[in-house]
Structures are given as C-alpha cells and as structure tokens.
Amino acid sequence: MIKGIQITKAANDNLLNSFWLLDSDKGEARCLAAKAEFAEDQIVAINELGQIEYRELAVDVAPTIKVEGGQHLNVNVLRRETLEDAVNNPDKYPQLTIRVSGYAVRFNSLTPEQQRDVITRTFTESL
C-alpha cells in the first residue's frame, strides 16, 4: 500500500519537512521533495530514512497506462476470395462490412487502393 507523508521529525535535518511516498509492500520510499541529500524521484529503502516521525497526507494515486509498444488487432472473419470477388463484383456485396482501425466500414465504400490495402493487410502468409 502506498501512503504519502511529510516528515516532521528526523535525526537527519535534510529530511525535516520533506515529502515522500512510502510503499509498504516493497519497503521503499520515493522522494517527492527534500531540502538536500535526496533527489526528486529517488527511491530508497524505508529504513534508510532512519528514525522519523511524520504526518500522513492524502494521496490520489492514479494507475498509469503505457501506450507505447501496444498492439492493435482487427478481426475480420472471411475468406480472401470473398474480398477479391467484392472488388470485382461490388453489386453482389452491398452489405459487406469489415473492421478497419477499430471502426466498421462497408467494403464497397473504400477506394480501390484502400480495398487492396485491406486485402494485403488481412491475409498474410505468416506472422
């Protein structure tokens, strides 16, 4: 569990009135602000703070979401031949709907270049 603290009494004067996040599960303390000796975001073992007294602070810890390196998958359940036939005979497939970049679109509303791109991206020999 993470709790925020302001140190009110410490043997080390540099810790006085400093702000920290204490992670009791990991036994770590993250420095938010200190006069000297400790850098912002520096992580130390809680016992390195020595004998301290503190007051707890209200902390709102929002989960962080990493977007970098994510994957995106569109699933279209059909055969390559169906899409190729739709390119050549659009009147036979007026309701053919596919997924493109997270939204549904009628295949016939795409330009010929976009249709070819969909076919190329949808059907590969290997991953």
UniProtKB/Swiss-Prot annotation:
PROSITE patterns recorded: GLY_RADICAL_1, GLY_RADICAL_2
Annotated Glycine radical domain residues: 5-127
InterPro entries cross-referenced by the UniProt entry: Auton_GlycylRad_Cofactor, Form_AcTrfase_GR_CS, Gly_radical, Glycyl_radical_cofactor_GrcA
GO annotations of cellular component type: cytosol
Glycine radical PTM sites in chain numbering: G102
Keyword Coiled coil among record annotations: no
Gene3D superfamilies referenced in this protein's UniProt entry, alphabetically: 3.20.70.20
Domain of life: Bacteria
Protein name (record): Autonomous glycyl radical cofactor
